[in-house]
Amino acid sequence: MRTPSWIRTLRRLALTSLAFAGLAGGARATWSIIIIDRSTGEVAIGCATCLENFDLQFWVPVMKVGVGGGCSQSAIDSTGDIRRAIWDGLDAGDAPLDILRTIKGFDGNYFNRQIGIVDMQGRAQSYTGGGCGAWAGGVKNRVGKISYAIQGNVLTGSPVVDDAEQAVLNTTGDLAEKLMAAMEAAAADGGDGRCSCSVSAPDSCGSPPPGFDPKTDKSAHCAFMMVGRIGDVDGGCDKTIGCGNGSYFLDLNIAFQTMNDPDPVIQLRTAFDAWRLNQIGRPDHILSTKAVTPASAPGNGTAAASLDVTAIDWQGVPVGHGGAIVTVQHAPGSASLAAIGTPVDHGDGSYSIPLTAGEGQGQDLFEVVLDDGVSPVTLFPYPAFDETATLTSDVASLSAAAGGTANLSLFGPEGTTPSYLLLCSASGTSPGMPIGPVVVPLNFDNVVVLSFLLRNSAHFVNTDGALLADGTQAAQFTVAANELAGLIGFDLAFAYFTHSPVTFASNAVVVNVQP
């Protein structure tokens, strides 16, 4: 159980004089790990050090949910100015390198600092001042959707950082799994050499030190891990409360330990496994499915769609029962066009929310929150609804074995009743076909020729005609059983253009051919 906040506050006050006397000149916060995942919006931070009776989470991290994270270590940030500069810089969208330059400009102790910063744009920096105790150094990188900064001082050696990096890169699962594995990898190499080797010469024994056993020997005395997800709430940031005090998806803090307590990374693993156990059967922010069908519609004020949600837990298992309170609103960045209906609980862990397109053009994003009675879970990435469509299909796929029909709705220029021609391609949508002043988003192939020759046939119904006065029209693509057997796995793209004269080309819609 986490120590009550008022007790932690009293401890900090009681230890303030000790911290300043014993740490201000040569404070060491040993290794820290900052990871972000741009695709999920997660920010993960972990840190450990060989200091007794200390709350590392109060002094080191900066957590900005959905924005980025940082750590200030080696020389204690007693004024809070370093962490506040990171906080404000991330909030303003400043690049981590520019934030470091800002800190260097006002900090007289920059030579003794070690700082890591990563933002949600994937930019990462790791700075190690020349005054940091050996072994000291760090790495930063951007690999796919993951960016990270890992740094440490008074370590047993570079393997502490290097092996933590490999754990980040090679561990499967979400950022919580990656962070836990990276903390354990660092600890397995001895971590803070003052605990595993020598207080006066932390890097003199090797990494890991001879005979070091991470199951029984100590790599640190205190440690923390936190993961912020979209929907979590930032705390504040100043010298009295720290900058990692919000409400987070994962928040484990092993503080105020002594040399007689078990290694804090071992304690983190125990707490982590218990936390994971409690997440079984609960909706996961990221793995829960959410999609709008159809994904696009015209912004005509009447087009209907459905936002469909299925609750999935962190192991990828459907929750399987209803009962969650579902709230849906337009997310940040949404065009806020569509009207949102009342959620429908299907009783099996799936929910449907009716949508009605608004009048106008743009893309809506929806913030879906499932509250299962334990805590609210905000689903991410936000599902999108594109209200700029000038062509839609009521199906996303057709079965080659069964055949079927794709009903195609055209939404073009109003008032002029222009002639149109709808075509189909099996070769993609880009770069498309230039026709007069427009580009029709279909690549020319034999299917385009076939759709032209068979226009207004039993297969391509009403694909050559005139739009109505309101700019709408309806067409169909219909196939019998096994007629598409040779196109299994292909995407059939449809688009139309107006002609006589050519003035307009629609978007493309894709129908996948399945077995």
Positions of predicted regions on the chain:
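Bacterial N-terminal signal peptides that target proteins for export
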Residues: 2-17
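N-terminal nucleophile
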Residues: 28-280
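Short S/T/G/P-enriched beta-strand
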Residues: 276-317, 325, 332-337, 369-390
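Extracellular/luminal low-complexity segments enriched in Ser/Thr/Pro
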Residues: 298, 352-360
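Low-complexity "stalk/linker" and mucin-like segments enriched in Ser/Thr/Pro/Ala/Gly
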Residues: 329-348, 353, 462
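Surface-exposed, short loops/turns at beta-strand junctions within beta-sandwich domains
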Residues: 357-363, 485-488
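Short, aromatic- and glycine-rich surface loops/edge beta-strands on solvent-exposed regions
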Residues: 362-372, 422, 492-496
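Residue-level hotspots within well-ordered secondary structure
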Residues: 388-515
